[in-house]
Amino acid sequence: MISLNDITLRNVNINDSDRLIKWRNSECIRKKMINAHIVQKEEHENWLRSVLNNSNAQWFIVNYKETAVGAMYITDISKKDKTSTWGMYVDRRYMGSVVGVLMEVIAIDKMVFDL
């Protein structure tokens, strides 16, 4: 059984580029994106560099027992207005499992208590 204690977060870094683009371009995730085109490597790398330098965004790799199972992001962070936007990518192997629900719980916790 998967529990919240088995889920950890770490900040995304440039070395996560290949993993993130693979998840982002997978059909099950891509078709749910506002911008549903297949992202090319150069476009993705430029985007990732800008994300990593954006103080109004936080991106995390979500691990389940040391295995990367998805990414979670909180963007458009306004400390003044206490608002933000969030989303996640879940590795296909974990879709339909409790991992997505736990990611939602963690995201809400971070937005309410850490921003």
What do the predicted segments below correspond to?
Residues 1-14:
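Conserved N-terminal entry element of GNAT/NAT acetyltransferase domains
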Residues 19, 85, 89, 102:
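Amphipathic alpha-helical recognition patches that constitute DNA-binding helices
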Residues 22-36:
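Helix-loop element at the rim of GNAT/NAT acetyltransferase active sites that forms part
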Residues 24, 44, 104-107:
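Polar/charged side chains located within well-ordered beta-strands of beta-rich proteins
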Residues 37, 42-93:
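Acetyl-CoA-dependent GNAT
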Residues 97-110:
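Conserved acetyl-CoA-binding loop-helix of GNAT-fold acetyltransferases
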Residues 113-115:
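Conserved GNAT acetyl-CoA-binding A-motif
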